[in-house]
Amino acid sequence: MIDIKLLEQLCLCNGISGDEGNVRNLIINEIKDCADDIKTDNLGNLIVFKKGKKSAKSKLMVSAHMDEVGLMVTDITSDGYLKFDEVGGIDRRVLPGKRVCVGRNGLNGVIGVKPIHLTNGDEKTAVPKMNDMYIDIGAESREDALKYVNYGDGINFEGDFKINGKTFVTKALDDRFGCYVLINLIKSEPEYDMYFTFVVQEEVGLRGARPAAFTVNPDFALVIESTTAADVAEVDASHQVCNLSKGATVTVMDRATVYDKEMISAAFELAEKNNIAVQYKRAVAGGNDSGAIHQSRGGVRTLAVSLPSRYIHAPSTAANLDDCESVLKLVKVLSDYIAGGNLAKGKTV
């Protein structure tokens, strides 16, 4: 069973790229009594060692990123409105009218844009540019705003966690669900010794994963992610990357990584053997920390296992609880299989 309370805590914890401290502290608090070693590196990555029942025959690193997409204050107008830019890739179409939390104190604000009745021609239907939007915090002047916020302050989307049957909607599922999976594995009794990395700044260029992988120096890596589903209205089946309620998603190739073929085969064989729902990601698109990890040192054999998610990189993301279970079960059996030495070290295919 998925621990809904913990997953909700992780998703609603604010932590855009470069400001992951609250998320890291939450994770440490969850694992401090069951992890054998916990270190935080200079960039903010959390590197955890968990002793298993047996010594590992292959060194495995299981990884997820702590950061979420968001915004950052870049300027403050003379009349107290905040100008901003994106932190990570965000669909601008969904921003106007969204409620946000500004700075570490979580000051409430709302994203505004020129009122529709004052627009003309193509302006009425055009997607607003970042420069044309602002955040209203109720300040009356720049001086007034500076009492509460400063240049460079992070801006998080205000979120909640709602469940409707097997479907749930929340913010920051990318990649707090991955963090949830790692926490679950650390709390369990793995068959073999394993390393776990909760990394920073994935959304702005895979920046934390490289030093984390360099430090651990694994033979194999599993990256736990969320990936776009696109199984929505008006999208032809041939363009649906993966589907909700169809299980864990395994990627063959994306814009940053060509994944290890033996690891892919092992994932599907173990899924069939253990009656775990699994599907292929049916598009070459996007990327994740695998892109940095697999190039570390002399190379790391890597696979990404993802949760199908609708409306990813937006203030609200939808996913399926059965898929969550499938990802968790697959990662558990696959991690024990790899750490147990069932795949030869080095490239064999």
Model-derived features: where do they sit?
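N-terminal hydrophobic/helix-forming segments and targeting peptides
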Residues: 1-349
